A protein has these predicted regions:
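C-terminal regulatory/interaction module of P-loop NTP-utilizing enzymes
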Residues: 1-148
Length: 148
């Protein structure tokens, strides 16, 4: 890394949601969506791990819920899983609670009445049905349909 830094010039390129200002999917501003997620990522992780606007550029030509869902399932979710080491509670804080389902696990139900010293816990799973629903994306912004 040090040798590369001595030989080359590096310029910081932060996400630029402004290039998505004219992109909306079913009335939802993609620029606002990206900005909101990145503010949360900056607080929960750091600004160097914010999501780049390039992921959303295909929406300029094809601003559909199907394309947005594809971007989230193929790019955004795996990226957040990597950033947060599959800490789904933090991923839920970034995306709201529509995309990640929480299942409460009762240790007695799971293991019977054995004398097991376990606390009840929870497991997480991706709610793939949410990706096709524009309201799931609106929930990231904490707004209802008529407020976007």
């Amino acid at each position: 890394d040090t040798a590369l830094r001595r030989r080359f010039f590096f310029k910081e390129m932060l996400p630029n949601p402004d290039v998505l200002a004219d992109v909306s999917v079913k009335g939802l501003s993609v620029s606002n969506l990206l900005t909101h997620m990145n503010k949360r990522i900056a607080v929960l992780y750091d600004r160097e791990h914010t999501i780049g606007h390039a992921y959303f550029m295909p929406l300029k030509k094809n601003p559909t819920i199907k394309k947005l869902a594809e971007i989230f399932t193929n790019n955004i979710i795996p990226l957040l899983q990597e950033y947060f080491y599959e800490d789904y509670e933090k991923i839920r804080l970034i995306l709201g609670n529509k995309f990640i389902a929480v299942n409460t696990v009762n240790s007695n139900d799971l293991f019977g009445q054995e004398d097991v010293d376990l606390d009840d816990g929870c497991s997480y799973e991706i709610n793939y049905a949410a990706f096709d629903d524009i309201e799931s994306y609106r929930s990231i912004l904490n707004v209802k349909e008529n407020e976007v």
